Amino acid sequence: MAMWVFGYGSLIWKTGFPFDESLPGFIKGYRRVFHQGSTDHRGTPDFPGRTVTLEAAHEEVCCGVAYKITKEEDKRDALLHLEVREKQYDQKEYLDFFTDSNASEPAVAGVMVYIASPDKKSNNNYLGPAPLEDIAKQIVKAKGPSGPNRDYLFNLEEALAQLGFKDKHVTDLANQVRHILSESEELDIDATAATANNV
């Protein structure tokens, strides 16, 4: 029996395990939010980054990619990889996955999804909601073993666009981060010019 894994964050562009088939599509009743703190990939314990998790939202969908794994050895390798990679995500759910918005039946029933819950007892890295500008400022500054937090956001934005998916939260956040970075560059240019004039 095949195992299916749904990716809605970095798994979209960086899978890290063998798979036999990938399907772009969506799950129902959830939305993607930057509410999870990352202290091991895109931030540190002293300054966490922010990565995506899922939040229940009755009328919404979350787009991503489902990966099919059939060989027993590949299943074991995938689970070992995911249990380490997603160790800060405290819930595993098995949800229906759709590829057609008009379909009443799922394309795949029971895709495995890792979710970081808002339960502080089981997930002490949960950061929760915050104003868009505050989240953007945190993402601009955060950096971890897997690289700058902003790269995670921009990679997610690009990966979704390549699949033809739109996610307003991701787009708005990426635009806010770009705005902060452009303002910072302008300040650096002004400071450099002022220093040159004083020489």
Swiss-Prot record:
Q: Which domain of life is it from?
A: Eukaryota
Keywords assigned by UniProt? Cytoplasm, Lyase
Q: Which GO terms describe its cellular component?
A: cytoplasm; cytosol
- For this UniProt entry, what is the primary localization, expressed as one broad class? cytoplasm
Return the EC number.
4.3.2.7
Query: What class does this enzyme belong to in the EC scheme?
Result: lyase
InterPro entries named in the record: ChaC, GGCT-like, GGCT-like_sf
Identify the cofactor(s).
Mn(2+)
Quick one: which residues bind substrate? V5, F6, G7, Y8, G9, S10
Q: Which reaction does it catalyse?
A: glutathione = L-cysteinylglycine + 5-oxo-L-proline
Determine if Cytoplasm is one of this entry's keywords.
yes
Family, per entry: Belongs to the gamma-glutamylcyclotransferase family.
Kindly provide the name given to this protein in its UniProt entry: Gamma-glutamylcyclotransferase 2-3
Organism, by scientific name, is Arabidopsis thaliana (Mouse-ear cress)
Gene expressing this chain: GGCT2;3
